[in-house]
Amino acid sequence: MGIIAIKVGKSKAAQEATVSHTASLAGNDSGANALFERLGISRVDTIETFLNSLMILHEGGPLFRNTISSMSCSGGEASLIADLADPLTLDFPEFTDIQINNLSSILGPLVHIANPLDYQTYIWHDQEKLTECFTEVLKCKNELSFLIMDFPRKDKCHDTAWEPAINAIISAKKSTGSRIAVLASLDENLSEDKAIRFLSEGIIPLTGLDSGLKSAVAALKIGESWRKSLAPKLLWKNWAEIESQIENEFESKKILKNIGVKVPQVEIVKSKEELLEKYKKFKGSVTLKGVGHAHKSEHSAIALDIRKIDDLTVALDNMQKSGAAPKGFIIEEFIQNGRIELLIGFVRDNAHGFLLTLGEGGVLSEIRNDTQNLVLPVSEEMIVNALKSLKISFALDLFFFIEAITSSPAVKSAPTDKAPKYIEPK
């Protein structure tokens, strides 16, 4: 059937509100998303979407394609559901020419035929015509179809006028076998007795347009996870809480180089004299960086594309005067013609395991927040999919980056009883 989860802890306030046993489950939110993705668990944000998602899974299981259709007797509803679905991973396929002709014959010349379909109210009391209309739409065999219907309160007015549409959708469901959900705009517009009636006929009762669509996405994510290759066993154990520490860039690159990752030529120095001596080893442009800051740009602790020794001296003097290099300097080979920076990070999350972060690097990385997180170990297929999901994927030379990343032992399978040494804190 699949698993749906709501996990608190996105915001700082939510993290502070979790106490006792729930606090131990809050953990790192990015880590939770990565772990759920790995395990094929679909995460939703609201109780309404949680219940709607369970309803879809209960009546037919996960979705395996993103194709949907919608029927309503209001143009406003048709437009609204189209707008709500637009940012999601759902698709409204166009009707075929045959379907358009058949629906035009059923609904008349005044109704525009499109998906989502506004069938209007010309045939509202004609059960036979409604059945023909609904059946024709369901024949397209989209993964899930929605019929938007809002029912009046029984204590305020009669709902007998809705019976032709109810009987019509039940008949269309039986004749086509397609998956169909009756979707009410508001919770109070679909009573429990109506929901039970629809369920008895194999029709999914859902409430809330936005929530109904997001529940379809949740069911789709589960279906997609079932089709993925079997992932390696997770790298996780009950690690002791240890205070983290920051290695300087020079030491970090030494670690990377020792495990097979290519790094630029780099030297660390303490004085101007040592810097000028080390500079002789470099053949092209260099970068000068101050040691002692996790984020160098904020402290003016970096100077790029230095081509002359005089410019190098000026950059060093400026950093010394501003206190931008409290622990010395790094001189590094400047990489020419860099098209884009890729951020690769590793974090040990005690609640979820080791996380690999892939994303856009550079000075705007935290503003753009274009990252994907994976729990280790990972396969090349998982890395490819993560890179393709980035906003900058259009600019990535996928073969180059994938080869560079997957050739590193950092993302290869590792024994589950111990963590790679290069990401264990000292």
Predicted regions and their residues:
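Active-site nucleotide/adenylate-binding loops and adjacent lid/helix of ATP-dependent enzymes
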Residues: 48, 55-66, 74, 97, ...
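Glycine-rich beta-alpha junction loops
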Residues: 7-12, 72-77, 98-99, 123, ...
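Gly/Pro-rich active-site capping loops and adjacent beta-alpha segments
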Residues: 341-368, 372
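Short glycine-cluster motifs
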Residues: 14-17, 64-144, 148-153, 157
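Structural motif
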Residues: 4, 118, 144-148, 181, ...
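Peripheral docking tails and interdomain loops at the edges
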Residues: 5-93, 166-261
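Buried hydrophobic positions in well-ordered alpha/beta secondary-structure cores of metabolic enzymes
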Residues: 50, 70, 145-147, 212, ...
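Low-acidity, Ser/Thr- and Arg-rich intrinsically disordered low-complexity segments
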Residues: 407-408, 413, 422
